[in-house]
Amino acid sequence: MSAKFFEESTPVAFAGQDAGPAPAFRWYDKDRLVHGRRLEDHLRFAVCYWHSLCWPGGDPFGGETFLRPWHHGTDAMAQARAKADVAFELFRLLDVPFFTFHDVDAAPEGASLAESVANLNAIADLFEAKMASAKVRLLWGTANLFTHRRYMAGAATNPDPDIFTYAAGQVRAALEVTHRLGGQNYVLWGGREGYETLLNTDLKRELDQLGRFVSLVVEHKHKIGFNGPILIEPKPKEPTKHQYDFDVATCYGFLARYDLLKDVKLNIEQNHAILAGHSFHHEVALAEALGVFGSLDVNRGDDLLGWDTDQFAMNVPELALVFHEILNRGGFTSGGLNFDAKIRRQSIDPDDLIHAHVGSMDACARAFLAAADMLDAGALTAPLDKRYEGWAGPEGRAILGGQRSLADLADRALGPGFDPQPRSGRQEYLESLVNRYV
């Protein structure tokens, strides 16, 4: 674009607690060393293309409010190139290491799949050229298999195998572009992989179709030499009444059933967790416990609303517990913190995009530093070890190691003087302890 979009022109930098009114980081000092790694390398922030650059500000009761110049015109590819110019300027101003995108975020759909793929490859060429002189890299790419009307009954789970085939072609193109751009992961989100009513749904058939589709993606990943994991993103509902990737536990069962645990991990989102009736902390902790944690879509939902509001993450105590869980198990590998979040409909100034990201990056940094302090002090890990210390002893190890039968345990329980007593869970103490850090 020839016209300047953002008022800001200087990349946002760390200024500390005395920062003035201009955009600045008060907590996010990217070069600060925490547990031997730079804060930037721990948090691995990514800006998402769709909410930041594609969303027009509409809702079910009203149309667009943002009036982005690249949303209007007669040349769709020219609009896509203009959008890319603003995107990479946003990445530069925020000084983020990563971005993410869907295929149709970046390039317009054509009259055929072949035309859509050609458009995507042309914009990928542009991305490649821009990345050659920029800091930003690709955290992950994905294909949009939920917006077009052909996918109203799903993509992989569609009753029509021709639509399954079309979706396969779309994913192949998106996966190959992700690989070409050096993407570190590839995401599959099944927004329409579910049902509206069981009256017209064959559950077993659709689950088998979904398992086969993900297996095909894994096979192609290996064929082209893509080394990153495939990530599935749990969500219980919206847009469908019930989605097959309901939550972490459901996804784990699906991956185990179709022998996909080796190659597929999970991309977990806060707003999706609360829609499933879980806390963000629960979903991350369970994914870590089951060995399927991959990455985070960091945002927040409104606890009083029953839909995906995708607000920017600002809840430091909530984030601190999540980061404590991740840091305690070694931190991110290929994953990161993707801002799957959108500014509010009334936030119509272009620089609102900058303020939103800066505020959320600072909240994440503040939470991460608190998590590191808690971990260093053993604030939560020491009480946890104490709570389960019996299982680290000889008898606990013997039980878990298969050296005791049910009869062995029953005989011991029936023995004289065997009267184990409960101990306090100390929940209130632990909650107050967390508050000392956040």
Curated annotation (Swiss-Prot):
Recorded GO MF terms: magnesium ion binding; xylose isomerase activity
Cofactor(s) essential for the protein: Mg(2+)
Recorded GO CC terms: cytoplasm
EC numbers on record: 5.3.1.5
Keywords: Carbohydrate metabolism, Cytoplasm, Isomerase, Magnesium, Metal-binding, Xylose metabolism
One of the protein's GO biological processes: D-xylose catabolic process
Cofactor, how bound (note): Binds 2 magnesium ions per subunit.
Enzyme class: isomerase
TM stretches of this protein: none
Residues where Mg(2+) 2 binds: 269, 272, 308, 310
Primary location: cytoplasm
Homology family: Belongs to the xylose isomerase family.
NCBIfam families assigned: PRK05474.1, xylose_isom_A
Name of the featured protein: Xylose isomerase
Organism: Bradyrhizobium diazoefficiens (strain JCM 10833 / BCRC 13528 / IAM 13628 / NBRC 14792 / USDA 110)
